[in-house]
């Protein structure tokens, strides 16, 4: 049966009619597809049969031609979800909606992340689909508004719990009569008194369960509300039946279960309240990041006057004044003044960093001592901190593959539990205690209320939220839950050398000669822009050397440099340069070879026809590199260096830090090939690089880890970003993934084990309904509480 549908795609990258014609021709070659591409509106209108194609098929076709399709991303706040069945149902409906590329719904954060094609659908349509299911949705609020809303919800839950507890306590005491054979005042045993207390709990305080159950059943779904409504209603209405019999003249005191329905609702509300409180703590890491942001800025207007303005009023190119002790409000560039900036909130480096004119400063870092004027370069959502917050938010809202089993089971969970409860009732009334309706009913109610789909739904996302949040506090940004799980499987870590294991810039590592010799070399090298020359000049400045005038400076390609100082010739360069000018180097030759064998670039110094000394320069290894490699080795993880540098230098550095294998002389475009070779050997590979030159290898690896700084967070290039470039965070990231996945497995074991053991025990009549309800209420609390242990995770 044909199912025709029209789709509209917004296409980018078209520059002329040839582009639009090419796309249109290619789309129309697809079977049973009619397409028109409009260059002016940059839209493609496509008529197709949904039995043959999905919208993503056309997107892929356009992208293969070298163009792209506009994709929007929406974040929605959802209210009314009570368990995993709710979040799974919403997710399925959104993913089936026309124009939706991908949707994930997180029960813990109560949010949906939807990527969609704007020509096909829009935000209002997506919200409408969620509301049709019986839930409420709205565009994501600001963190402040969300916090206020959740505080109000928590207060509302607490108030309902308090009222329910007050009404339930007298009924709970009637349970104690049966358990401990206690004597209670007659009024507590009076059916009318129990009815008056239980009814508002059932139909006012517990009305939310009926509403939730109705909305789900109306849309063909089942969730926790259905179980609670069925279980408590069975107990309540059976008690009404017994009351009517007694009121009609029955001589025996009725067997009432008002206390069962009332106490069940109270216990479930108690569990939900504890769960909400615990879940609010899972977002602490994100809240702390948000609190780092400055609230206002000191703007210098066109007249040179200062005025304080809210942060959202600062624009790019605005001039801002920052005084000592104030936060840098936005990313910018210093145009006046100098200071030291505490960047520890982004890089983890405790020592303030000196900043001068033209240096870049990062929003939300702290100005420690000087008065500076900056020009804003990035504001709002473009700042480094905003990008970090975005990564953490997306990671905390994402799903890990390990969650799939729980999602599948929770989709069928409630109908299966209802079937088991019905079967339990039939077995009890026909086989266990034939004709004993009450015993059968109690066993069935226990089955209904002990089953807990909530624990299944919370097991993975709460651990992901807390684990990624804790990692972010330590400068480790996971892109999503999927990458937490994949990092856990890594057995080989490949390192780029320059900028990853080393500082990425040459430094003087050895100097042999007197201060006058250093003056000569630095004065000559001050005429060069070469990185080695810069390293020598910086070294001289550190040793308080005063430079002198140089004439006839000349670069000698492949050899070094020459210059005239005080009418005498200076040569700085390699062994061949010295030999060409008959300079005797025997006294220094052995030391030179030793330094070169260790990967240093050695330059000999001759002045006025005589050897004056030697200076060696190298890209020095980071202090933490050796310890990082040792930590990886202790975790039984193989380490590899992949570099474009020469083999001698690479092996020297590898030996210094303890790396297992060296692959040297590799061009950037060939690095991905070597990653593939390791993967073909059945290794799960993580690639650690700078996120720019190593982009192909980062993408090819099972896990790409980018070493970023506050201004160069390579978020798009890698699955994990290490802030500040501290290589010790690489083993810590892997350790964090191990801890988080272990926590998830503990949660899933508890969630599955609880239901697998609890339901049969309840079916055998070994648990009173109120005990079963208490167990259900506390099961999800225990899962969230276990996840919160990750907040204390040591990295």
Swiss-Prot record:
EC number: 7.2.2.8
Active site positions: 496
Domain HMA: 5-70, 72-138
Principal location class: membrane
Source species, domain of life: Bacteria
Membrane topology per record: Multi-pass membrane protein
GO cellular component labels: plasma membrane
Keyword vocabulary terms for this entry: ATP-binding, Cell membrane, Copper, Copper transport, Ion transport, Magnesium, Membrane, Metal-binding, Nucleotide-binding, Phosphoprotein, Repeat, Translocase, Transmembrane, Transmembrane helix, Transport
Gene Ontology BP terms: copper ion homeostasis
PROSITE patterns xref list: ATPASE_E1_E2, HMA_1, HMA_2
PANTHER family: ATP7, ISOFORM B, P-TYPE CU(+) TRANSPORTER
Family designation: Belongs to the cation transport ATPase (P-type) (TC 3.A.3) family. Type IB subfamily.
Protein name: Copper-exporting P-type ATPase
Origin species: Staphylococcus haemolyticus (strain JCSC1435)
Organism placement in taxonomy: Bacteria, Bacillati, Bacillota, Bacilli, Bacillales
